[in-house]
């Protein structure tokens, strides 16, 4: 990234943080199209929640998946929830578990906890209380299940 690009990206992130979402989307879009995972993730959030514009499930999924496939842990977690809840994409517990596991492998404790709950409840995966206990323990909960 050039100095100008750094300044533009910083401005786009500042617009997002200031909740100027329509402007942020416009500024983040070129970076997302160039493969910037953080820009892709932020755009996904804007489209998924209809922030500053009409909600767009197709674009929310497109950008969340693009960022997740690049290894962006928060996007992997977000994509896991999309699949778990059937939001922006068809509900798919196996896919949810796969993306939560990828995020958990990068240290996302929330993904570990969600995965543990899935195994505890048999939600989208086969119920496995032993696996649920193991995951809860990894997430820092000693007395769960």
Model-inferred region functions:
Residues 4-34:
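Alpha-helical segment of the N-proximal tetratricopeptide repeat
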Residues 41-42, 77-78, 93, 110-114, ...:
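Alpha-solenoid helical repeat scaffolds
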Residues 30-31, 65-67, 102-103, 138-139:
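Canonical positions in the second alpha-helix
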Residues 3-4, 19-20, 33-36, 49-51, ...:
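Short helix-capping/linker turns of helical repeat alpha-solenoids
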Residues 62-63, 69-71, 77, 81:
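Helix-adjacent hinge/juxtasegments
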Residues 8-9, 14, 42-49, 53, ...:
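Hydrophobic face of amphipathic alpha-helices that form TPR/SEL1-like repeat modules
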Residues 17-26, 54-63, 90-99, 126-137:
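Structural signature of tandem alpha-helical TPR/SEL1-like repeats
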């Amino acid at each position: 990234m050039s100095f100008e690009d750094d300044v533009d990206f910083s401005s786009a992130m500042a617009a997002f943080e200031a909740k100027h979402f329509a402007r942020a989307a416009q500024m983040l879009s070129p970076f997302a199209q160039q493969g910037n995972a953080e820009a892709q993730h932020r755009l996904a959030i804007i489209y998924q929640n209809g922030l500053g514009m009409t909600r767009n499930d197709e674009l929310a999924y497109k950008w969340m998946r693009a960022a997740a496939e690049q290894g962006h842990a928060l996007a992997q977690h977000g994509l896991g929830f999309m699949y778990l809840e059937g939001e922006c994409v068809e509900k798919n517990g196996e896919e949810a578990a796969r993306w939560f596991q990828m995020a958990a492998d990068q240290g996302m404790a929330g993904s570990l906890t969600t995965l543990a709950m899935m195994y505890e409840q048999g939600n989208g995966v086969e119920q496995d209380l032993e696996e649920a206990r193991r995951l809860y323990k990894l997430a820092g909960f000693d007395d769960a299940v």
